[in-house]
Amino acid sequence: MPSLRTRREEAEMELSVPGPSPWTPAAQARVRDAPAVTHPGSAACGTPCCSDTELEAICPHYQQPDCDTRTEDKEFLHKEDIHEDLESQAEISENYAGDVSQVPELGDLCDDVSERDWGVPEGRRLPQSLSQEGDFTPAAMGLLRGPLGEKDLDCNGFDSRFSLSPNLMACQEIPTEERPHPYDMGGQSFQHSVDLTGHEGVPTAESPLICNECGKTFQGNPDLIQRQIVHTGEASFMCDDCGKTFSQNSVLKNRHRSHMSEKAYQCSECGKAFRGHSDFSRHQSHHSSERPYMCNECGKAFSQNSSLKKHQKSHMSEKPYECNECGKAFRRSSNLIQHQRIHSGEKPYVCSECGKAFRRSSNLIKHHRTHTGEKPFECGECGKAFSQSAHLRKHQRVHTGEKPYECNDCGKPFSRVSNLIKHHRVHTGEKPYKCSDCGKAFSQSSSLIQHRRIHTGEKPHVCNVCGKAFSYSSVLRKHQIIHTGEKPYRCSVCGKAFSHSSALIQHQGVHTGDKPYACHECGKTFGRSSNLILHQRVHTGEKPYECTECGKTFSQSSTLIQHQRIHNGLKPHECNQCGKAFNRSSNLIHHQKVHTGEKPYTCVECGKGFSQSSHLIQHQIIHTGERPYKCSECGKAFSQRSVLIQHQRIHTGVKPYDCAACGKAFSQRSKLIKHQLIHTRE
């Protein structure tokens, strides 16, 4: 008589067998949680049970209306009537050998047909409470439902062959317990090969289970199997809503929740709703300043238990796994194995698409999604999908408002640890990214990448409308507004709209009178940084804009454009009163005051009025006696810059004003005008 096991023992034995577990995590949980009991009728039935539910599944007599199993003393009073018209075991096996799933329930046929008649060993029949759809992985169902004839199994004890492994197992259990299983290990003998396999798969403290891919250790076989699925990328659980497949049932459940439109958890403070209770709890902690989770080591408090656990790892001093190359220590052997590949340069995981190699299999899996476009991690709040779970977690903080990373210096919180690291360099002044061409250092790698484009001339951001290329994506976005005509930034004071936020900020200085940009040479202030840059060229003498016709240089591009109109004779600005044209709009504005008689600029000293501010400035020098413009050749000083320029032509010999009639040249425009009168008299 083979030894009988409770359902708990059977489950633990199944879980310990090496290789993929045929039970899903949900089924395993129900087995572990079930109390182990033996019904009083086990002597009659021959099978110990965990519950009445299992008793119904195992004992066929229990299922029949004429089976009295519920007497006061709970004894089994088995009826002896047996249906005489039952098919024989051979006929039933022949009818259902092709597909085990088609075998009817025991109670549907006869209350006296035993488990052994169906080729299922006593004590190994799956309880009814566990035979739910979804309790087995597709791989396990494939083993149970394999086609007849794929593999015939021999029984060593009899001249019998079986097409289904459960029938073979039943046959092998018929020999007596004096006949131990030929496999022996550690001095223990087993009647069933599955018992021996289960015994071999039980990990001990001396021999934990190790993942061959990453070196990570596990104390339980189900954990190892789950880890191996991560490396293989096997996806066995399919979502009925969208058809996506997942490697873990827990991830599938999360997927189901993302399809649910209901948001059951609503914040009473701000009204924001959440589908998941964990997201809701995290969000609520931000309304309260309470920090109930305190570190016993340093006393630091946190609003969330998960943040405390992460922090506590920083106090863990034990790192038993040390690198022989650099001495760096790790808490896990798997981390040491991955670290050692830095020294060896080993990259065993190669992408079959592009040949790129990686040190970690997880990095290869993430990289492969760049080729497939797969984004399996979806946000339950907004539906946005991501290729990596870490990116999803970072994104979800946008909805929850969680900022778990806090600066120790100023207390500023951040949602991402990378942002905290970048911010911390503000306090330390660290600039670890140095340009190999000019030596300039930067605090962020992205700033270095953008800077290097100055040396390479690279302009990777191209406008799809006009084809113009730019070094920075931000400049491209600003440029594209030219094509759309969009002006989203509007002044709240006067309603004027701008295409760029920077232009709006500069404009608002007109209303506030704010001039934040000061010249460190003379102290003059400006409302725009661009105006300050132009002004500073007065002190430096820089004139980067050169006329291609005469070689004259200018400090501003607008001044060059105006100058070029002297050569081409273009005068686009015409007075609507008298028709006189000008090459500058400012000259037209000044001229129009001749018609209006307007003189808005008044001297505070003598009260004289002027139509132009420049004329007033020049006039005021009469009262002050100031002569700020000095000739570098002879030292002579002048009150006006234009007079200095005319004077310098004495030293240079330049005569830019030519007479169109006779070709004579003059150093001053006024002298040319006087000369032209000679020709007009003629």
From Swiss-Prot:
Keyword NADP recorded: no
Annotated region (Required for nuclear localization), positions in chain: 268-393, 341-373, 473-503
Keywords: Acetylation, Activator, Cell cycle, Cell division, DNA-binding, Isopeptide bond, Metal-binding, Mitogen, Nucleus, Repeat, Transcription, Transcription regulation, Ubl conjugation, Zinc, Zinc-finger
Record Pfam families: zf-C2H2
Gene Ontology MF: a single term: zinc ion binding
Modification type N6-acetyllysine: residues: 487
GO cellular component, one term: nucleolus
Region named Necessary for transcription activation: 62-210
Alphabetized SMART domains for the sequence: ZnF_C2H2
Cross-link (Glycyl lysine isopeptide (Lys-Gly) (interchain with G-Cter in SUMO2)): 253
S-S bonds: none
Tissues and organs where the protein is expressed, per its UniProt entry: Ubiquitous.
Top-rank lineage group of the source organism: Eukaryota
Cellular localization per UniProt: Nucleus
GO biological process: cell division; cellular response to sodium dodecyl sulfate; negative regulation of apoptotic process; positive regulation of cell cycle phase transition; positive regulation of cell division; positive regulation of cell population proliferation; positive regulation of erythrocyte differentiation; positive regulation of kinase activity
Compositional bias of kind Basic and acidic residues: 1-10
Span of zinc fingers (C2H2-type): 209-231, 237-259, 265-287, 293-315, 321-343, 349-371, 377-399, 405-427, 433-455, 461-483, 489-511, 517-539, 545-567, 573-595, 601-623, 629-651, 657-679
Stated induction or repression of this protein's expression: Up-regulated by hemin during erythroid differentiation. Up-regulated by phorbol myristate acetate (PMA) during megakaryocytic differentiation. Up-regulated by the transcriptional activator MEF2A.
Function: Acts as a transcriptional activator. Promotes cell proliferation by facilitating the cell cycle phase transition from the S to G2/M phase. Involved in both the hemin- and phorbol myristate acetate (PMA)-induced erythroid and megakaryocytic differentiation, respectively. Also plays a role as an inhibitor of cell apoptosis.
Subunit structure: Interacts with INCA1; the interaction inhibits INCA1 activity and induces the cell cycle process.
Protein family: Belongs to the krueppel C2H2-type zinc-finger protein family.
Name used for this protein in its record: Zinc finger protein 16
Source organism per UniProt: Homo sapiens (Human)
